[in-house]
């Protein structure tokens, strides 16, 4: 198998952000196909709450990073779908992160749930167009639920800033880190 020269670098790393404590196991219990789109919409609905606690360009984050990266994800999935239709095998490496507010065990669990919500979104994207490729191993996803981010974030005195502060916001994410295509 030869590695093809498809270039996805314009998309990478693709960071997709999550509100505090989302998704939860209950989200998946109530909605087994709970996916990132739902998390994205729910997060956007909390913009006013984040604005109360965080004046540091929060609107820029919500527009550029949250909305912008969701749109970028959809463009990437369209391209991947086309490449898969052309006979490529594609491997995605996805890493989940959490802020430092909770303990390590919880952070690994929520990171894993975040990855699961993204995989569910990929599965449901464009009426399930990518499903067959996941089933026949033409689209492979390597999951790395890291837990707590490797950033230099310090625990602050204010628990509200541990939820609404810039460091916490930027650490609650799933990143598509690597994409390899083979033909």
What is the meaning of each model-derived region?
Residues 94-97, 111, 144:
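Solvent-exposed beta-strand motifs enriched in subsets of small alpha/beta binding domains
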Residues 4, 18, 24-95, 123, ...:
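Periplasmic peptidoglycan-binding/anchoring modules of Gram-negative envelope and division proteins
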Residues 13-16, 20, 25, 83, ...:
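Periplasmic OmpA/Pal-like peptidoglycan-binding modules at the C-termini of bacterial envelope proteins
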Residues 29-32, 106-107, 156-157:
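Short coil/turn segments at secondary-structure boundaries
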Residues 100-104:
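Short, solvent-exposed loop/turn segments at secondary-structure junctions
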Residues 106-119, 160:
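Short, low-complexity, polybasic intrinsically disordered segments
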Residues 9-10:
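An acidic-aromatic substrate-binding cleft motif
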């Amino acid at each position: 198998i030869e590695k093809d020269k498809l270039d996805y670098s314009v998309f990478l790393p693709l960071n997709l952000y999550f509100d505090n404590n989302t998704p939860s196991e209950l989200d998946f219990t109530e909605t087994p196909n709970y996916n990132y789109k739902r998390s994205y919409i729910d997060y956007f609905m909390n913009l006013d709450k984040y604005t109360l606690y965080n004046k540091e360009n929060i609107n820029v984050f919500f527009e550029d990073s949250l909305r912008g990266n969701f749109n970028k994800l959809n463009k990437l999935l369209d391209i991947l779908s086309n490449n898969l239709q052309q006979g490529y095998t594609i491997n995605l490496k996805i890493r989940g992160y959490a802020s430092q507010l909770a303990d390590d065990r919880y952070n690994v669990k929520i990171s894993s749930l975040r990855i699961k919500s993204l995989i569910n979104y990929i599965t449901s994207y464009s009426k399930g167009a990518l499903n067959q490729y996941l089933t026949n191993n033409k689209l492979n996803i390597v999951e790395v639920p890291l837990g707590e981010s490797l950033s230099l974030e310090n625990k602050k005195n204010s628990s509200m800033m541990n939820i609404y502060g810039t460091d916490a916001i930027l650490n609650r994410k799933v990143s598509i880190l690597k994409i390899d295509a083979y033909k």
